[in-house]
Amino acid sequence: MFGEFLSIIVRSIKLDKTLYKDNKNFGEAAIYFAAIIILLTAIIGLIPGSIFLQFMSGVFGSANIQGPSVRSVIITTIIVWLIKTAYLYFVGVVLFPSKTTKCNYRKILVTVGYASSPLILNSFIVDIKLLYFMFIPYIWYNVSLIIGINQILKYESYFKSTIIVLAPIILLFLFFVSQLFNNHSSVVS
């Protein structure tokens, strides 16, 4: 059982698309494997977060900056996992299905959990000099999620799954850029 769990993590990190094609990976234990991966990545995510807070407290001269509690990180991670899965289900299955798309919410929930495996690599970020490398596992996670969504929703090309997965990030980036330009164009008196 533990060997199967490690195999899922390694295959997800290797971006193996057969991980998502094999129905035995979506059996009874799949939801537990996905939940463990999600919780593991949430707890590991505290490492770069605490390093960032230490750096920022040194920059701004404040020694009293505390990060979120482990409980709030776990609860937030589970809520974000459910919301992201609901978004992917609604957009991928309800709005833009392919002709052969037959997928349920649980399968997408497990896929999002499996695709989170590259975020385990954040455990190697133990110094402020390595903090910039935390974007590599996040990009890796998005690529893994694109592959997983493409396989379980049976899309013909990766373009559709890429747009579906990256649309919230693109919209957030565009909002950020628009706010940046709005702040520069206003006059402060």
Question: For each predicted feature, which ranges?
Answer:
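Juxtamembrane transmembrane-helix termini
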Residues: 51-55, 96, 147-154, 182-186
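Selected alpha-helical membrane-embedding segments in polytopic membrane proteins
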Residues: 1-103
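Transmembrane helix-loop junctions in multi-pass membrane proteins
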Residues: 47-56, 120-131, 181
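Short alpha-helical linear motifs
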Residues: 57-61, 129-135, 184-189
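Juxtamembrane boundary at the C-terminal end of a transmembrane helix
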Residues: 173-189
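Hydrophobic alpha-helical transmembrane segments and adjacent short intramembrane/lumenal linkers
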Residues: 89-177
